[in-house]
Amino acid sequence: MKKLIIIFTTTILLQGCSNINGEVTLVSENSNSGFNFPYFLFIPEEAKQNKSVFLIVEPNNTGFTSDDFTDHQDQAENLATNDHNLGNFLAHELGYPLLIPVFPRGKENWKIYTHALDRDAMRQKGNSIERIDLQLLAMADNAKKKLVSMGFSIEEKIVLTGFSASGTFANRFTSIHPNEVSVCIAGGLNGLLILPTNSINNTTLNYPLGINDFFEITGNDFDSVAFRNTPQFLFMGELDDNDAAKYGDAYDDDEREIIYNIIGKSMQPDRWTKSVDEYKKFGVNAELKTYRNIGHEPSEVIKKDILTFLRDNLKK
């Protein structure tokens, strides 16, 4: 198992910008508070201090490997400030603040797919990317404190969103920390979800395919009740052909063999149908949708459906 040690320093404590229909702040890393990388906090102009709000959290997805940290920071800032992106769109529509972490995805250690929270990422020890899932929770706690100091009333649980690699991150994160997530929104998922089972057809499913070695990887037992009850909106475009299962950074050869032979070699409809069926069989409180004539994108139609889903579930 490769280990990655990243030395990252910054003299920026808070950097604000207010020309994007809101205010974005780059919050410096704070290892004493539990996170080794900075994050962006976006407060849309629609956010009101006289009502209770949720913190939207969307993991960053650079889309490529790089050992230049500024590449990841630039892409994370775009996620935070561009309303084409899912998290920013929802922040404006709901009037909720948005957190985007700046986790690296290294080129030298390219098999550690941090932005998808893969097995390699979860097994890191003794370096700056150890347990980035816990670092993300620490960032959220830090952001909530800042927002409270500004006069906002913040709900305890987060709204977790993601698309493509960050959608996979969101799905896996929700399986690990279901009690921290009020609602999970995830799409562009390669037709593959973490399945809430130890095995299928006598084939063991370890993380991130299933939950067989969940305690070994996460340090906690899988909370089946909390995961089952957490509202989730999980979607694929019918024309989506972006299949991470083909690549060595997303899955190793053993994982790929299981995916192809047990879950489905064809991303759609076979693999996605199997994932959907497993979630329905387990009784997950999820809306699982396939959108016709849509590829690998969170289209306007999808965004509107997500907005309706969030409004229905966050008022309960």
Predicted regions and their residues:
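Sec-dependent N-terminal signal peptides
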Residues: 4-14
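A domain-start/cap signature at the N-terminus of enzymes
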Residues: 17-56, 63-71, 88-97, 158-163, ...
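Structural cue for short, hydrophobic secondary-structure segments
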Residues: 56-61, 100, 234-235
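Active-site machinery of serine-nucleophile hydrolases
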Residues: 62-142, 275-278
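Conserved acidic catalytic loop of the alpha/beta-hydrolase fold
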Residues: 135-155
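Short glycine-enriched nucleophile-adjacent loop
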Residues: 167-178
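The feature captures the conserved acid-bearing segment of alpha/beta-hydrolase catalytic domains
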Residues: 183-282
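C-terminal catalytic histidine-bearing segment of alpha/beta-hydrolase fold enzymes
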Residues: 270-316
